């Protein structure tokens, strides 16, 4: 503790070194570091004041907020250094859960939209809705990049989405090194995204870290929403909710 003498601050113990322990008046409050955020993208919400971040450009007509929610126009791929259509929130702990609700009607396999967890354009996990040309239906798929090395954790067999489904909910849970995706169709039950053997697909969350990425590493992990159209730039995705919760 510090006291003032003749206009100068002095240590209360009269010495020049702070004691290892000291008493304070009253009970010390327990800090609450848990963070939670939820939005339905109201017309009057200031996205930037709500902590949303974007890559390189804040204007240009690639996003808008209306009565139906947040609308993203299809932009470049997650590995692009140019015109990406993406809005993200910072991940604030080592254990957290985020989810969104969206409507998306792709017509080409190069049109995707969904939830992305990333460090930068070299390191990310992406759960998305796209179009399967063989099955002629929408599918839920996943794409990962580890220092620029791409992989499709679900292989070619995405999760089929029936034509009657209007709203698709996507979720991601991170617990330390483990990242697990989930999904729900309309008002149905949540399902964990599974690998080919039927077990939950567990991805490596540690690839999205300063230590792993290495050179040029400073961004921190983010999670959010994106729409990609590498076909004709006509696709749009509507997101009517997003939530984030530290666990």
Describe each PLM feature range.
Residues 4-247:
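Extracellular glycan-recognition regions
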